[in-house]
């Protein structure tokens, strides 16, 4: 008797999981959102390391991430020149309040396009460094009819080893069959519910990350280390970098202009600053990266601007957190 019950339970479990995988409800469940309906849309994509304090969390469902964002609030207005910003944690605004981010600073300038449409900038940055992650987000963003895509990049996003970002892994086009099962999707489904529940305290407080005073401030004195990740001098080879991903992004953008920006960084002047620009980059690697980017931009007709030293080091309170004051972005 017990054996028959166990067997039936197992059969029902397998059948349910197979049906779940066949129906694949994650996409429409992600689009079923209270944001932009009951709660305002978030000004940046959901991401968080301390959900209970930040009223925010990291999840893998792109549909849910975009449904919670203000870009999904309504169809694109006829008088709007829509700009989307793609990039890493500095674009998203790590340790910056929403009104301090690059998108907010640009919106505060009340810019007008040449045809008199009002410029509206949307923050679609997402923490961590990966061109493939950025391209995945860009692909989804194209469904919201941007008139311009601004992609802020830095050398840390280019190594081959960074391309399999967790968001990319979770959104593969052909996952393993068992990865589609309900049993494998339990955490992701729970995260969809949690994102909706956090809408109440977020809408009430406006808090979407923990602004800790205990963060690592940028260092002006550096170690005498000339390595970049696993790479050593003297040569940074093209094969070390995922430059082809930019070509894929241009194809995704299609006729929409894509502006690639080598984002500003803090430049140290203290001990061993003749070896390294900062904690992340030895001079030899970063200099060669800039040369490679300029050459590729010229050869492949990229819209590219190099702002690597546009912001003084004093404007950075941590390595990835420049104060995006309008005097530098105007």
Model-found features: residue ranges?
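Second-shell loop/turn segments in exported
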Residues: 89-96, 123-127, 234-237, 279-283, ...
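Membrane/wall-proximal cationic-aromatic binding patches
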Residues: 25-116, 314-315
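Short hydrophobic segments within beta-strands
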Residues: 86-88, 152, 261
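Conserved SGNH/GDSL esterase-like catalytic core that processes O-acyl groups on lipids
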Residues: 90-177
């Amino acid at each position: 008797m017990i054996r028959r019950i166990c067997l039936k339970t197992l059969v029902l479990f397998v059948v349910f999981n197979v049906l779940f995988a066949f129906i694949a409800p994650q996409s429409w469940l992600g689009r079923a959102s209270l944001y932009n309906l009951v709660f305002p849309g978030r000004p940046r994509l959901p991401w968080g390391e301390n959900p209970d304090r930040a009223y925010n969390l990291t999840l893998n469902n792109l549909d849910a991430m975009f449904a919670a964002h203000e870009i999904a609030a309504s169809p694109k207005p006829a008088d709007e020149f829509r700009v989307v910003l793609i990039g890493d944690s500095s674009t998203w605004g790590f340790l910056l309040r929403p009104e301090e981010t690059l998108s907010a600073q640009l919106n505060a300038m009340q810019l007008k396009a040449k045809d008199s449409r009002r410029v509206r900038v949307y923050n679609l940055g997402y923490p961590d460094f990966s061109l493939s992650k950025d391209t995945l987000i860009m692909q989804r963003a194209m469904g919201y009819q941007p008139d311009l895509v601004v992609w802020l990049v830095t050398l840390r996003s280019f190594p081959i080893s960074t391309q399999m970002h967790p968001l990319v892994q979770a959104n593969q086009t052909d996952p393993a069959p068992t990865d589609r099962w309900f049993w494998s999707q339990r955490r992701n489904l729970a995260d969809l519910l949690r994102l909706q529940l956090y809408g109440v305290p977020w809408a009430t407080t406006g808090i979407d990350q923990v602004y800790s005073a205990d963060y690592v401030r940028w260092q002006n004195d550096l170690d005498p280390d000339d390595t970049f990740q696993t790479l050593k001098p003297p040569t940074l080879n093209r094969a070390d970098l995922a430059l082809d991903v930019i070509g894929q992004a241009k194809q995704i953008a299609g006729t929409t202009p894509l502006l690639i920006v080598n984002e500003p960084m803090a430049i140290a002047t203290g001990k061993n600053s003749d070896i390294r620009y900062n904690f992340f980059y030895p001079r030899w690697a970063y200099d060669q990266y800039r040369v490679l980017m300029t050459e590729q931009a010229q050869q492949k007709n990229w819209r590219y601007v190099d702002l690597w030293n546009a912001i003084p080091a004093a404007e950075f309170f941590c390595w990835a957190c420049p104060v995006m004051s309008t005097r530098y972005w105007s």
